[in-house]
A protein has these predicted regions:
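RNase H-like, Mg2+-dependent phosphodiesterase core
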Residues: 1-212
Length: 212
């Protein structure tokens, strides 16, 4: 009855949070329809412009969607796997109450699909069965939807962060969204990391002595 697509974005970023998107599709509501938004695919395979165009239609097409995040500090303190599980838990809690209640009342009627090769959900889904599928963000529409929602939400947050903190301008976060780039690495080497950087991810760039 419920297909729950799950995907993460920002896992490999040097700065900013990691985000987990969840998209729930209720089969009885969609009644076998295949009219998902045109161009919907893995968020990493489509342009930022198209992702922005898809953001609202995707949220309207699915039964429910939500995004949870874990901060750079939480990633440093807990590790990326725990941070992903925490983000998933937060995303689930952000789903509408009626959807969460319906799934909780009949967990055997739900199936979660997680993109990747490793199940980092932990106990986030409780008794709901989950399967891990490589390239699910490309091949499963529910996971593609989760990927787009998470990517747009995280990108917007990074842009807002960069706008609110002029001191972040040398790092180019508005453009690189926290990922590695020549300008980003050069700024790290010249200015050092900020509170928004994942210090445990910078040892190869800066060395332990410069970080801790």
């Amino acid at each position: 009855e419920f297909v729950i697509g799950i995907d993460e974005v920002g896992r490999g970023s040097l700065a900013g949070p990691v985000a987990v998107g969840i998209a729930v599709i209720r089969r009885s509501s969609h009644d076998g329809r295949s009219d998902w938004p045109a161009k919907l695919a893995d968020s990493k395979l489509i342009s930022e412009k198209i992702r922005e165009e898809l953001y609202e239609p995707v949220q309207q097409w699915v039964t429910a969607s939500a995004v949870g995040m874990a901060s750079a500090q939480e990633i440093d303190e807990q590790g990326i796997i725990a941070a992903l599980s925490l983000s998933a838990t937060r995303a689930i809690r952000a789903l509408p109450v009626d959807v969460r209640s319906a799934i909780a009342a009949a967990p055997e009627s739900a199936q979660a699909i997680l993109d990747g090769s490793h199940n980092w959900l932990g106990g986030a889904l409780g008794p709901v069965a989950s399967m891990v599928q490589t390239k699910a963000d490309r091949d499963c529409v529910s996971v593609s939807a989760a990927s787009v929602v998470a990517k747009v939400a995280r990108d917007r947050l990074i842009v807002e962060l960069a706008s609110a903190h002029p001191e972040l301008e040398p790092y180019g976060l508005a453009g690189n969204k926290g990922y590695s780039s020549a300008a980003h690495i050069a700024a790290l080497q010249e200015l050092g990391p900020t509170e928004h950087h994942r210090k445990t991810w910078l040892t190869k760039i800066l060395g332990n002595d410069a970080l801790f």
